[in-house]
């Protein structure tokens, strides 16, 4: 999609991105893993275009000395998995499982339904 932000650092700049609509009769909220969708998209881009400059190297949110993707994801795990040509989706499951389980335990007391 194309959009033009009305505030913040990209105000009045034509930007583009991807929007995924997860809906429909077969949609399963408990099974849908949006982080994994974008991780697999990165992996597909890397496989199809191995020389593509996927990781931007400018400072992000005042975090100097780290790649923005590592800041956003809390570490280099996603980037390293994406760049490893031998890494599989099953490896991503192992990489994400501990954090997902910890998050599930933290959020449980706050769920209302």
Model-derived regions: residue spans:
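C-terminal regions of mature proteins
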Residues: 79-113
């Amino acid at each position: 999609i194309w959009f033009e932000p009305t505030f913040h650092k990209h105000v009045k700049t034509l930007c583009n991105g991807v929007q995924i609509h997860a809906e429909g009769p077969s949609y399963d909220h408990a099974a849908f893993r949006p982080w994994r969708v974008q991780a697999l998209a990165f992996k597909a881009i890397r496989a199809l275009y191995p020389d593509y400059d996927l990781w931007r190297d400018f400072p992000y949110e005042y975090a100097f000395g780290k790649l923005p993707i590592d800041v956003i994801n809390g570490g280099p795990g996603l980037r390293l998995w994406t760049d490893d040509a031998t890494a599989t989706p099953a490896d991503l499951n192992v990489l994400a499982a501990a954090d997902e389980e910890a998050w599930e335990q933290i959020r449980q007391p706050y769920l209302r339904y």
